[in-house]
Amino acid sequence: MSEKINQIVEELKTLTLLEASELVAAIEETFGVDASASTGGGVVMAVAPAAAEEVEEKTEFTVMLDEVPADKKIAVLKVVRTLTGLGLKEAKELVESTPKMVQEGLGKDAAEDAKKQIEDAGGKVSLT
């Protein structure tokens, strides 16, 4: 924008509601336009709800085991076995080959609970 436009915008920001209303009336009279017939505001209102609808809360989560410190492998292994029902060998392979998916298709609460259990045991977890 030009400097002149920027100055006008800054000046408009300082107007009270009454002054802004008077300004609109003066512009309507001077230029022979009707601000109430403007469709610009309607378009903005129509777009805003559509954008809000696109932001849906995720309902299914995948628990990813990102990293396990060497001194925490046994504790994390026990938690992974409890969460997944895997055997000792399978759970050990999962823990030693991070990053790996631990569980998928979980609800938010279940995923948060699994994440907390693994983190409490010393593992680093992410939810996707």
From Swiss-Prot:
Residues 103-128 are annotated as: Disordered. Keywords: Chloroplast, Plastid, Ribonucleoprotein, Ribosomal protein. Forms part of the ribosomal stalk which helps the ribosome interact with GTP-bound translation factors. Is thus essential for accurate translation. Residues 106-122 have a biased composition (Basic and acidic residues). GO terms for biological process: translation. It is found in: Plastid, Chloroplast. The keyword Ribonucleoprotein applies. NCBIfam families: L12 (TIGR00855). Its main location: plastid. It holds the Pfam family Ribosomal_L12. Homodimer. Part of the ribosomal stalk of the 50S ribosomal subunit. Forms a multimeric L10(L12)X complex, where L10 forms an elongated spine to which 2 to 4 L12 dimers bind in a sequential fashion. Binds GTP-bound translation factors. The keyword Chloroplast applies. One of its GO terms (cellular component) is cytosolic large ribosomal subunit. One of its GO terms (molecular function) is structural constituent of ribosome. This is Large ribosomal subunit protein bL12c. Belongs to the bacterial ribosomal protein bL12 family.
